[in-house]
Amino acid sequence: MATLEAARKQIAPVSFDDAPQLRVLTCGSVDDGKSTLLGRLLFDIHAVLEDQLQALDSESRRWGTQGAGRDYALLLDGLSAEREQGITIDVAYRYFSTRRRSFIMADTPGHEQYTRNMATGASQADLAIILIDARRGVLPQTRRHAFIAATLGVRHAVLAINKMDLAGFSEARFDEIVAQFASAAQALGLRSVVAVPLCARDGDNVATRSDRMGWYAGPTLLEHLETVDVASDAQDISGFRLPVQLVARPDAEFRGYAGTIAGGAVRPGDEIVALPSAKRARIARIVTADGDRPEAGEGDAVTLTLDREIDIARGDVLAAAASAPEPVAKLTATLLWMADESLLIGRDYALHLGPATASARIESIHHAVDVETYAPRPATWLALNELGSVTIALDRKLVAAPYRDVRALGAFILVDRVTRQTVALGVVDALPLAATAPTATSVRPTQILRPARWALPLAAGAAMAALAGLLTHDPATTATLGLANVLVFAVARRIENLLA
């Protein structure tokens, strides 16, 4: 312990705003030590001021869970409910720098009921620190968090096996947990996974090497975070893309289109196409807070003016004319369902994809994901915190892209139209080739049975399916889907019709 404290004092505090940035997420099951780890890391790199330490000591005596010692988790858990219950509820962000790198750390909750908050933190992360309690090993919530992080584009992970003191600093236990997670890491497609044994409370292998685990020859957590290469994860986008967030009209002489460039680069004179209208123009100016620029690229917030006026609204996408994508009205996506009421086929929601919005209908559920094995399993609905693959039909065409290719055009949320609650987070997996707006299926009754078609809306369940089989050459489910698009049924009955 004395060696750890002496080593910590040799770490000088720094603040380099121009250092390369790494966005880090901590995740894992409840009570695995996520907040304690980040708090201890902040302490070890001298990112905690003296008055903050005094306040921490006072709060530790009142709220702490470490007896007479400091409770470093309180540096992150700021809500009164978090301190009273000793848990993390909301996402806490911390910003700090070392000589090598600047960091944005997102401390996320481990409780299953706050999974939506964890997903929020994962949506912008480059690397995930997956905490595991050395006594309990890999839990279902550990696997769920790892899957969500990977689904949201995180390609690098640290397997932080914490509370090694409670496992006797056992190398065998460390190796056992690493082996438990190995199959999951392979299934998730992670590019790098580094396992580090820790005692976050005491600082072992956090920022300084532990003398209590001499068998471990790898880097400390901080050493790995400072050196991990995430530059190779940059998106490879063929052509310029800018979702329009605002049409700027400060006066009668200026009309510009503001947004953050999602990919590619743009220069004055470049030909662009506005989607979905397909109107063309050329870039006249690239305006920023620092004045006009000769060029702008991915991640730059700009306002573009054009050489002629065309109809462009918030939610449209400006794209390079030579590589413009095709707007679509159907998506295949992975959803994280975040509402108490289950997701059902046929339900309508408001879809928000960046600044663009559309009415969306769940057309089909392909499968749910088993969080234990990551294998698909049959499903007709998704319950709270379940993940699954679905097809979504839109009422109008939007510009979208697979999330793995363009994050800004591949992530969306679904909102309940009545409660205005966000009910799902989704990422686009694929764009079907025949992506057209949903329409009612054409039903072709025979001349003899034509009068009977008016009885169809009054039937339900198996009766609906049987009648549909008589009245059309199409499969019963196809017929009922078309009718459900144009007839006003109770939600439960419409779902019954589709599943009959």
Predicted feature residues:
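C-terminal effector/interaction modules appended to NTPase cores
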Residues: 2-24, 29-35, 98-99, 250-452
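P-loop NTPase switch module centered on the Walker A-proximal segment
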Residues: 4-8, 12-113, 125
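Residue-level signature of catalytic and energy-coupling elements of molecular machines
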Residues: 31, 37, 56, 86, ...
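Active-site phosphate-binding and catalytic loops of NTP-dependent enzymes
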Residues: 63-66, 77-89, 184-193, 226-240, ...
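Conserved Switch II/interswitch segment of TRAFAC-class P-loop GTPases
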Residues: 101-103, 108-114, 123-146, 154-175
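Canonical P-loop GTPase G-domain recognition
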Residues: 167-233
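Accessory interdomain/linker segments of ATP-dependent helicases and helicase-like nucleic-acid enzymes
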Residues: 201, 218-258, 273, 280, ...
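Glycine-rich phosphate-binding loop of ATP-dependent small-molecule kinases
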Residues: 430-500
